[in-house]
Design a protein with these regions (language model features):
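...with weaker cross-activation on analogous glycine-rich loops/strands in unrelated enzymes
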Residues: 2-4, 41, 45, 53, ...
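A short, polar/proline- and glycine-enriched secondary-structure boundary/capping micro-motif
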Residues: 122-128
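Glycine-rich, acidic and aromatic/proline-enriched surface loops and short helix-turn segments
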Residues: 11-19, 54-61, 107
Length: 194
């Protein structure tokens, strides 16, 4: 099965990092614009929902237009079981309005693995406590069974006898496709021209 179009768009942004200090990251400002919030001019404003909305827009779908992660609890249709690409909405602290949103790429009993924006100030895959999950959502069209596999931990073992990590496999495939490989050289800044 193919990955959903919004996931292809999100993987293409993998590694974008927020500018530290003065100045703003053009890619992050573009996420605000594409999500319908061209009024935001600084990347210091929380941008996980902007990233989610921008990736949906790139796939020809409307997001919520809000910068509130929890706004996605009312978007699309609810999912009972997680699918790769599902919009996962999480709680954040004790504030009933605060949250985080990203795209589900894997899960196990304890953790959800999300591809999302503003995760350690970057577009990355990060693990979150599964107890924080408030809801999983899916666009009204296409149906999840048409494009996405259930998100679960892999049971296959790697050459070291440990369980294979499906999130690592996805990330590695992306790096190999986009960058042509990787290096252990600490002076190599990465990128396709190196």
């Amino acid at each position: 099965m193919d990955q959903p179009a919004w996931m292809a768009a999100a993987w293409a942004e993998f590694g974008v990092r927020e500018t530290l200090g003065p100045g703003n990251t053009p890619a992050v400002l573009a996420y605000y614009r594409e999500a319908g919030r061209a009024d935001i001019k600084q990347d210091a404003v929380a941008w996980c929902a902007a990233f989610t909305g921008a990736m949906l827009a790139r796939a020809g779908m409307a997001g919520t237009g809000s910068l509130l992660a929890r706004s996605y609890l009312d978007w699309g249709t609810p999912l009972e079981d997680g699918r790769v690409g599902a919009v996962a909405v999480l709680s954040r602290g004790s504030d009933p309005q605060a949250g985080h949103v990203g795209f589900l790429v894997g899960r196990n009993e304890r953790a959800l693995f999300l591809l999302g924006g503003n995760q350690d100030d970057s577009v990355s895959v990060a693990a979150f406590d599964a107890k924080r999950l408030l809801g999983l959502r899916w666009p009204k069209d296409p149906a999840p069974d048409e494009v996405a596999e259930p998100a679960q931990a892999a049971s296959a073992s790697n050459e070291h006898g440990r369980d294979a990590d499906p999130v690592f496999a996805i990330a590695l495939a992306h790096v190999l496709k986009m960058e042509g490989g990787f290096s252990n050289d600490p002076y190599d800044p990465g990128g396709p021209t190196n």
